[in-house]
Amino acid sequence: MTLSLTNVLETPPTDGWPDEALPLRVELPPAEPFPMDALPAVMADYGHVIQRCSQAPDALVGNSLLGAASLAVQPYVNVQLPHGAIVPTSLYVISVAESGERKSAVDRLALHPHAMFEKSKSGEQREAIEERKRLPKAEMEKTEVPREAVFLASDPTVEGLCKLLYNGLPSIGVFSAEGGRFLGGYGMSDDASLRTAAGLSLFWDGAPVDRVRAGDGASKLYGRRVALHLMAQPRAALQWLQNPILKDQGLFSRCLIAYPQSTAGTRLFRPERADETPAAANYVARMAELLAGPWPIDEFHELKPRTLRIVDEARELWIDQHNQIEQAIAGELREVRGLASKAAEYLARIAAVLTLMNDPAATLVTVDAMKSATILMEFYLGEALRLSNVQPKHEQADLAMMLWTWLAQRGKRYVTLPEMAQFGPAKLRKAQTLRMLMNVLSEHYLVRPVPDGMVEYNGKKRREAWEVRL
């Protein structure tokens, strides 16, 4: 076997690389602790209990409680920003966690009162259906069909959401401990992702949403609310967050994302049950009080939430935070300017949710709630910055790392496709795979192609060859 540089070119085109080599994977810096004590005591106390009993990551617990609170509060109140705009109190939360991080257990505990509410509504629906069936046919045909009772939806399309909100409850939650099903499902396929993102963005904004029905035209949905909390594994979540179409559309700027440190390997057995503690009883009672209603619904089945105002000290704090964030958009928050541009609105939304969790009859956002919202928003902006340049871990990166390790250990300046196909890692010896991976390595300035015929292998000039950065 011979590997030599021909003298076709007097000066090889390989002097000087265009840039510093880029890592195949960017390692995440450690996550900051979730500020659990920024939540109202009725939530924070239960959050600490869930964390202690389930030993799940802290932000997984915090996000679950915050999402659950938003779902309970959103039918009742909007919040008026100091400049006059009135916005919903819906929150969109995304938790990133590996398999086995107790996502389902945490979700079940946070949403237990919501599941009981949904079960109660389902029972009412069944009773109404049976009563309707007992009516004389002529009278039954004049009676409205009982509405659907779905309150918690796991992976619907926007079309499915519109149908649920039209035929059922005017406020629902998209909550899933297996959010990868939603992120990778039909609603987020290449053809449907933009439509799904646009629809979810409109729901977050509180704007009317078009509902197109085959056969009977179109209508608009007014007065509907959607809260969202998706838990997903890193590969699915980070690939979704790297989608350039969705980045440009603006959905991500409406999402509060956390990727906490794993607790795997530290979870020794503990016999305590979170749902049998006084903190659980207090949390369930407060959520049940909020969910019980009655919801402010008009004759058109549209929500008519009252408006919480931000005044006095809370207003001054909001304005101060607004100005600080706005100035930072040109500096340290430049990489997350989408979320940063909505951070002041999110401050108001979170503060309103926390206010109602403390006092369901409140009419003004409290300064304590605004202080807590500031702490929480700082956490989410920090998480967004931490995740802003992270590449999703996927098989292509793993395989590229495998090939790069072989090239580095081989220690030769030039390599050809036939040599890699013959002697490279056994898993990577198909020409198509090798070309794809060498492109990845080239994009990271670890290799670069050389002109046809410049390198010989086994006595033949090769068309496909690369220089290796050693």
Please annotate each region the language model reported.
Residues 2-470:
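Phosphate-handling catalytic cores of nucleic-acid transaction enzymes
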